[in-house]
């Protein structure tokens, strides 16, 4: 399935295989989480973050699935340290085009499939299960917005931060020809409740207010977010869709 491709003419006579019910988290241990392929990023975040654990390099939206992340070579704002999502996969199961079910694909078992799956977007087979690494985290992050008018200064500072790897998360924005922003986020152990920008889940007002562009446009210096809100800051309704109706100027 996926966007506007699901009803294309060439698919009319094809056999549809429904995978939406592969949505169970199978097990969570200290260093890994094992899921069926249609488990979403949002499901994972809400199970692991309360345990002070997270999957590195998840894309920043709540409805991406782990199977889609693996086939699509996903990444996030801590990928500059941890690599792509695929670099943090322990093993996975896949049904190939000839019907074979290949289990426990890893760096040492069917390594051709392990290293070849990224960027295939479902053409190699149907992923049914994915086991991912877990790393330590905190429940909150402090986000700093570093604003620049000079591209050279912006680029120099961004390059240095990437090299030093001191930030837990980092991304950068070119807002206009002479307006640039580095956005870095770091875990914090404690924060006062009144300092947290958003505390309510699935609220349109939350989604509107926490949009990273809103903070940049308002020239914020910093704010605090729950880690789950930061990790899902580009969820579809929050970012891709809502901006079309009321864009920030």
Language-model features: where?
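Noncatalytic alpha-helical scaffold of FAD-dependent oxidoreductases
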Residues: 1-249
